[in-house]
Amino acid sequence: MLRQTVLQLAVQGRLARQEPWDEPAVKLVERIRKEKGQLVKDGKIGKTKLTPEIESEEIPYPIPKNWIWTRLDHITYISTGSTPSTSTKEYYIGGSIPWVTSSLTSQKLIFNADTKITEKAVEDCSLKIYPEGTLLVALYGQGKTRGQVSELGIPATINQACSAIVFWKANAPVKEYLKLVLTGNYEKIRSISAGGAQPNLNGDKIKRTLIPLPPLAEQHRIVARVDALMKLCDALEARLKERAAVQGRLVGSVVKEVVS
């Protein structure tokens, strides 16, 4: 609860100071979208249809005047992967390319994959090898998996149960803040899933995710502040566990005295 409160305050502009000389977030978005357009033109990322602009009734709460509401796919490139046929041995035997599934998104940083695939699998299945630093959002999976956010610590391919959020020069500095926003919206992201016994997210829902974007300088202040507060949460939780353990031993000693 305490961690969630910290994250909510952070994305509402109530955790770090606002400075009038910070470049407005709208300028940052303009640069990101311009560079994204050039990357599409150069064939470095795929051309995708942008989700609609944000309607006023979608905005959940007010933000500071030099912030901007944007959709996730307006400031990143979002794609997914697939599963090479397991009946085709050439896709797996001797493979060296990591293939990441949603089960690994419980890790904050992914440095290894349980399964490796071959270059033939990548080519035949039109898989993308996403660069180190790509964020992953689990679209579906067992238990708490759906909605989890992780980061690739290695270049890797992914399966269809993950959305990959890709960064480039202009938007790379916003990655840590976006990770914070997505992590803080874990329950909300899970709530927009569709389906019956095992609800699923999909790429379009991830693309449409609303992001309250501060100026870049303020993003850095927010991330630093959240990191410091999360360390305090870690220390508090450790103390509470220690106190509970001591109390448990004390109760055990009293019971032993009573029954002996």
What are these regions (language model features)?
Residues E53-E58, D73-T88, S103-E132:
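Sequence-specific dsDNA recognition surfaces
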Residues T101-S102, N112-D114, T118-T183, G195, ...:
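A short beta-sheet element
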Residues V6-A10, R14, K36, V40, ...:
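A generic secondary-structure signal for well-formed alpha-helical elements
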Residues M1-E58:
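Extended, domain-scale alpha-helical bundle/helix-rich regions
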Residues Q4-T5, R14-L15, E55-S82, R208, ...:
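Non-catalytic DNA-recognition/assembly elements of restriction-modification systems
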